[in-house]
Design a protein with these regions (language model features):
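Short beta-strand to alpha-helix junction loop
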Residues: 68-77, 102-114
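Short, surface-exposed acidic
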Residues: 87-100
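Rossmann-like dinucleotide-binding core of oxidoreductases
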Residues: 1-90, 124-125, 147, 176, ...
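A conserved short coil-to-beta-strand element within the FAD-binding core of flavoproteins
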Residues: 101-103, 118, 122-142
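Hydrophobic, well-ordered secondary-structure elements that form the walls
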Residues: 119, 153, 199, 222
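FAD-binding beta-loop-beta segment adjacent to the flavin cofactor pocket
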Residues: 111-116, 169-200
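Flavin (primarily FAD) binding-site architecture
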Residues: 2-5, 154-172
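Core beta-strand elements of the Rossmann-like FAD/NAD(P) dinucleotide-binding domain
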Residues: 142-151, 155
Length: 240
């Protein structure tokens, strides 16, 4: 998505324009290098790494309150995002373009500490409207502004709620998984789907959590699938 590639492209391109359909909320990425002292502690007592991992996990779990729309936690998340914007973008005009006009959580909150700085570079221009059409080498925004381009990069994110593979999978009644989910995505533990025997899905419905690591979810789903396959093998079950 653009949040990932814009900072890298900004370092390479002589000039770049970023088309923005709507401003996202961003929170800082809290990555840092471990100090030499911390590394020595981990080496002497490996259990400290497990404790740190547990602390990070439960810190992430506290963010679930934001997802449940608990007012105090929603307000704290919004304040964090807007403070991050204010700290990284000094130009008030650019900051206004990057300020969302909707409540936090209406679309996925993004995590980056280098996206805003990329947009403040002299060789980067923010077009605060969508790309409407392309005529030859000219990109035209929804507001009618025209930009001559050498390269057009489409970076509109991921189809998290409409997985492309669903069109290729058909169940017992011949209906595709995509059509089955047309009125809403449902699945048992986000893994198995009624009417689609022997189908196991990783990262199925409602597993795209925004408050913690999805790796934990994947590991739990893999355990479920392995247990199901072991049960089928042990009891000679052909269809699950």
């Amino acid at each position: 998505s653009a949040i990932q590639i814009v900072p890298e492209l900004a370092r390479l391109a002589s000039s770049m324009v970023v088309f923005q359909r709507s401003a996202p909320y961003l929170i800082p990425r809290a990555n840092r290098s471990y100090t030499a002292a911390e590394k020595r502690l981990f080496s002497r007592d490996p259990s400290l790494m497990h404790k740190l991992r547990a602390d990070l996990f439960w810190t992430g779990e506290t963010n679930f309150a934001q997802r449940r729309n608990v007012p105090r936690f929603v307000r704290e998340a919004k304040d964090m995002a807007l403070s991050h914007l204010h700290d990284q973008v000094a130009d008030p005009a650019l900051r206004a373009k990057l300020t969302p006009d909707y409540e936090i959580g209406c679309k996925r909150v993004l995590i980056s500490s280098d996206y805003y700085p990329a947009l403040t570079r002299d060789n980067v221009q923010l077009e605060a409207s969508a790309l409407a059409r392309v005529e030859g080498n000219t990109a035209i925004s929804a507001d009618g502004r025209r930009y001559e381009l050498d390269v057009l990069v489409c970076a509109t994110g991921f189809e998290a709620t409409r997985p492309p593979f669903a069109k290729a999978i058909h169940g017992r009644q011949g209906i595709s998984l995509d059509a089955h989910w047309d009125q809403g995505m449902q699945g048992l533990d986000s893994i198995a789907v009624h009417g689609f025997p022997n189908l196991f899905i990783i990262n199925g419905p409602n597993t795209g959590l925004g408050h913690n690591s999805v790796v934990y979810i994947i590991e739990a789903q893999v355990d479920y699938i392995l247990d199901a396959l072991e049960h089928a093998d042990r009891h000679h079950v052909a269809v699950l």
